[in-house]
């Protein structure tokens, strides 16, 4: 279920994050305290959330990335009515779809962890 509500705004945010990854982050030492990295966390959220909702969650994640936080594994979460096959495409040689993300229910079963395959 790709975010189609505001594709232009999502595309701008996605392009800016990819630019950051390619031109700035690639030339600095790896120092992220979390998995997935904050920029990947942002890209994954932009696939599932509206851009404004995603920006709020991304801001909280970036603010928690400081020396006083222990870090660790922190997957983004989203609310969906039902899980679906996300960002699939047909392989040119075979007639099957490739799974890009797994949606794993949290303990509350109201939200899902977004895990990239």
Curated annotation (Swiss-Prot):
Alphabetical list of InterPro entries matching this protein: Membr_insert_effic_factor_YidD
UniProt keyword terms in alphabetical order: Cell inner membrane, Cell membrane, Membrane
Record bears the keyword Cell inner membrane: yes
Localization of this protein: Cell inner membrane
Topology in the lipid bilayer: Peripheral membrane protein
Gene Ontology cellular-component annotations: plasma membrane
Cell inner membrane in keyword set: yes
Function: Could be involved in insertion of integral membrane proteins into the membrane.
Family under the similarity heading: Belongs to the UPF0161 family.
Annotated protein name in UniProt: Putative membrane protein insertion efficiency factor
Native source organism of the sequence: Helicobacter pylori (strain ATCC 700392 / 26695) (Campylobacter pylori)
